[in-house]
From Swiss-Prot:
Pfam families: Epimerase. It comes from the Eukaryota. It is found in: Mitochondrion outer membrane. This is Protein fmp52-1, mitochondrial. Its main location: mitochondrion. GO terms for biological process: import into nucleus. Belongs to the FMP52 family. The keyword Mitochondrion applies. The keyword Mitochondrion applies. InterPro entries: Epimerase_deHydtase (IPR001509), NAD(P)-bd_dom_sf (IPR036291).
């Protein structure tokens, strides 16, 4: 039975990760660290312990103090340029907190790190967002977890709480394409709940050492891998 920790639990993918973790018979305890109380905590959950604070400088110490030590640390944490007030602030928040929390998990003795990244992530990208995501990935790989799992979904289909008009339009198109034929959608967009289940399944498999050959240290899942693992 695994004990896990999660940041990003109130986002579109993260909320589904939390739901999947709470329902999974192989997960004994779930600790979330967030700015807002996750929706799943509105009802009593025997497995769930939440830490809620707007002061993100407290998050790493909270993670370090968890008992038992989480076997798996999940991050689907992110923000937007608009919410952060510009890309420079977005970088400080998203890159800074992801790296800080991953380091705290590693130092505490966590074995598996599962990061929800993005398709096109590359430290060499000319696109600032993709470069940021790539830099987070590279720092995660260098931390030396027993297993690092990186998911690179395309467009994420689902309902967000915050307004992102262009993304909403693309999600509408993805939804229509999926109704015509799933293959028209799966190559470039994945449902949030499918991504979440893939993250949970991959994390638990990695904990057991059940990873593809050649991916013993770092396992990267693209769109087709996410679809396959998320529908198991």
């Amino acid at each position: 039975m695994a004990s896990v920790a999660l940041i990003g639990c109130t986002g579109m993918v993260g909320s589904h990760i939390l739901t999947s973790l709470l329902a999974h018979p192989s997960v004994a305890r779930v600790d979330t660290i967030s700015r807002r109380t996750p929706n799943a905590a509105s009802a009593a959950q025997a497995k769930l312990t939440t830490f809620v604070s707007d002061d993100t400088s407290k998050w790493a110490s909270q993670l370090s103090a968890l008992t038992p030590i989480p076997s798996i640390f999940f991050s689907s944490f992110g923000t937007t340029r608009a919410a952060a007030g510009g890309f420079e602030n977005q970088y400080k928040i998203e890159h800074g907190l992801n790296v800080e929390m991953a380091r705290a998990a590693r130092d505490a003795g966590t074995k598996v790190y599962v990061l929800v990244s993005s398709s096109g992530a590359s430290k060499d990208s000319s696109i600032p967002y993709s470069r940021m995501k790539g830099e987070i990935e590279e720092e995660a790989k260098a931390m030396g977890f027993e297993h690092t799992v990186i998911l690179r979904p395309g467009l994420i289909s689902g309902t967000r709480e915050e307004s992102r008009p262009l993304e909403a339009a693309a999600r509408y198109i993805a939804g229509f394409a999926g109704k015509v034929h799933s293959g028209l959608k799966d190559s470039w967009a994945q449902d949030a709940d499918v991504i979440a289940k893939a993250a949970v399944n991959a994390g638990l498999k990695a904990l057991e050492g059940d990873v593809p050959a050649g991916s013993e240290k770092v396992w990267v899942l693209g769109g087709s891998d996410i679809i396959k693992l998320g529908k198991e």
